[in-house]
Amino acid sequence: MGQKVHPNGIRLGIVKPWNSTWYANTKEFADNLDSDFKVRQFLTKELSKASVSRLVIERPAKSIRVTIHTARPGIVIGKKGEDVEKLRKVVADIAGVPAQINIAEVRKPELDAKLVADSISSQLERRVMFRRAMKRAVQNAMRLGAKGIKVEVSGRLGGAEIARTEWYREGRVPLHTLRADIDYNTSEAHTTYGVIGVKVWIFKGEILGGMAAVEQPEPAAQPKKQQRKGRK
């Protein structure tokens, strides 16, 4: 069986950055990890309608800085920054240190795997035909400059008795090329028939120079060895 490695995990440190960037000693590591998890859980639930793509957590000098990548920054910020201030206070309480929240706008949500997957799952919950939702997502991504996209849905599609998996692909999605910038994410649609899983891979092109290339010295030309003739 051809099982696939996680496209983001295998590219960490090559072309993909980490979502949490901090260092801690052995004593503090578990607490930091636990508060990271709780902060992500809270923000994901609180901003479920704000089209959040990524949450990046940093911990500079006894504080916590959260960068929210969203396609709808107005919803996160709220009137005169009221909503973001409420979020900051809760995050500070969870982490137990002063908190800072930054907002980063996602310019092209059609090229973000998480936002595309969430869009498809919300359409499935509204009883849109799964093939139509998949094709629309693929066409929008290709129109905005994606080199390739693959969308997969699995579950009781169309209310069928037997669960199945269907996928649709356009362009190239080279999963084995480590320098390929592949954005991968998943989402779930909670329908009356059960849960339908959605997976999205978006290939945006190759990142050259992600890591310093080491030039290999050319091997010196070696004299050819004469072959001995075997005895007859």
UniProtKB/Swiss-Prot annotation:
Keywords: Ribonucleoprotein, Ribosomal protein, RNA-binding, rRNA-binding. InterPro entries: KH_dom, KH_dom-like_a/b, KH_dom_type_2, KH_sf_prok-type, Ribosomal_S3_C_sf, Ribosomal_uS3_bac-typ, Ribosomal_uS3_C, Ribosomal_uS3_CS. It comes from the Bacteria. It holds the Pfam family Ribosomal_S3_C. SMART domains: KH. One of its GO terms (biological process) is translation. HAMAP family: Ribosomal_uS3_B (MF_01309_B). PANTHER family: 30S/40S RIBOSOMAL PROTEIN S3 (PTHR11760), SMALL RIBOSOMAL SUBUNIT PROTEIN US3C (PTHR11760:SF19). NCBIfam families: rpsC_bact. Belongs to the universal ribosomal protein uS3 family. This is Small ribosomal subunit protein uS3. The gene is rpsC.
